[in-house]
Amino acid sequence: MTNLRKTHPLMKIINNSFIDLPAPSNISSWWNFGSLLGICLIVQILTGLFLAMHYTSDTTTAFSSVTHICRDVNYGWLIRYLHANGASMFFICLFLHVGRGIYYGSYMFLETWNIGVLLLFAVMATAFMGYVLPWGQMSFWGATVITNLLSAIPYIGTDLVEWIWGGFSVDKATLTRFFAFHFILPFIVAALAGVHLLFLHETGSNNPSGLPSDADKIPFHPYYTIKDILGVLLFILILTSLVLFSPDLLGDPDNYTPANPLNTPPHIKPEWYFLFAYAILRSIPNKLGGVLALVLSILVLAVIPLLHTSKQRSMMFRPFSQCLFWILVADLLTLTWIGGQPVEHPFIIIGQLASILYFLLILVLMPIASLLENNLLKW
């Protein structure tokens, strides 16, 4: 068996990726989220596949088909809520994974990091289109509002929006194409994740100290396989608790009302994991400016490696940078809260200040703090 594992062309790839992979001996539980994201993707693809067997992407029957899944299909309610809450778990793991990358300087692996940013965009696009499919009120109006933002693009904006809609409003054509894209994108995400791993294994994993770990490597199996299994068990515990005890905790009650183009909900807002970006979008009074800020709020991740001014890789031994990092985390939580609030005083000004602070921290304050730390260490 050992021989086959190391000689068979397919088994060799698996062996070099998950069994005999040399891994740093000191990577903490913050390194568990990569495997958890893989599990999330598998759960989403499987539950999504079973949902697609019963779902109809037609405006007249989409809402009814989701109701039918929940009421009449064996364990349909379980599959539906695993899929919906699985998306929330996916984003929790994503945010923690990206946060880990920023804290420990993993972004210095440029190829891996850039593919990761691309993956983040792809997953966000997938989640947005998936939210439209149940064809509830928030599905319809969320799709209308977010796609309409593209009309802010000069000259081609209006034509672009109508081209995406497949008509003059969000309708049957829009729903059908969103279903098609929502089905295909996770497989593209899986392929990109493979490339992400390929690039990572070219360099090997980073570790909390940010120092080279070539002198102290251990095999991935059994040490990190057992550690990943513990992470997966905790993940399953949280996901099943969420699904079985409060499946609608993170959803919007408006989505239990069928889509009605003649009736606008009082507060249109996306799912919780987009609220921070939505808050940044709303904090700018100009439409095009808001759209640019929205895109840049994620795209700013791609410039983080260029702004690394510290002589150390990780933040483990940099208290100033640590303080700014946790202020950034608090700021993102503030933006998430603001994104779910109505557009009125004092939420408007809080959102604007939090948006300014977000970009200021990443683009200005953190690079300056790194230079200051270099100076204090006389480097």
From Swiss-Prot:
Changing S213L: In strain: Isolate SO-03/2/17-2. A ubiquinone binds at H201. Keywords: Electron transport, Heme, Iron, Membrane, Metal-binding, Mitochondrion, Mitochondrion inner membrane, Respiratory chain, Transmembrane, Transmembrane helix, Transport, Ubiquinone. GO terms for molecular function: metal ion binding; ubiquinol-cytochrome-c reductase activity. It is found in: Mitochondrion inner membrane. Binds 2 heme b groups non-covalently. Pfam families: Cytochrom_B_C, Cytochrome_B. InterPro entries: Cyt_b/b6_C, Cyt_b/b6_C_sf, Cyt_b/b6_N, Cytb/b6-like_sf, Cytochrome_b, Cytochrome_b_C_euk/bac, Cytochrome_b_N_euk/bac, Di-haem_cyt_TM. It is a multi-pass membrane protein. One of its GO terms (biological process) is mitochondrial electron transport, ubiquinol to cytochrome c. One of its GO terms (cellular component) is mitochondrial inner membrane. Its main location: mitochondrion. Heme b b566 binds at H97, H196. Its cofactor is heme b. Changing K6T: In strain: Isolate SO-03/2/17-2. Heme b b562 binds at H83, H182. The chain crosses the membrane at residues 33-53, 77-98, 113-133, 178-198, 226-246, 288-308, 320-340, 347-367. Heme 1 (or BL or b562) is low-potential and absorbs at about 562 nm, and heme 2 (or BH or b566) is high-potential and absorbs at about 566 nm. The cytochrome bc1 complex contains 11 subunits: 3 respiratory subunits (MT-CYB, CYC1 and UQCRFS1), 2 core proteins (UQCRC1 and UQCRC2) and 6 low-molecular weight proteins (UQCRH/QCR6, UQCRB/QCR7, UQCRQ/QCR8, UQCR10/QCR9, UQCR11/QCR10 and a cleavage product of UQCRFS1). This cytochrome bc1 complex then forms a dimer. Component of the ubiquinol-cytochrome c reductase complex (complex III or cytochrome b-c1 complex) that is part of the mitochondrial respiratory chain. The b-c1 complex mediates electron transfer from ubiquinol to cytochrome c. Contributes to the generation of a proton gradient across the mitochondrial membrane that is then used for ATP synthesis. Belongs to the cytochrome b family. This is Cytochrome b. It comes from Sorex saussurei (Saussure's shrew).
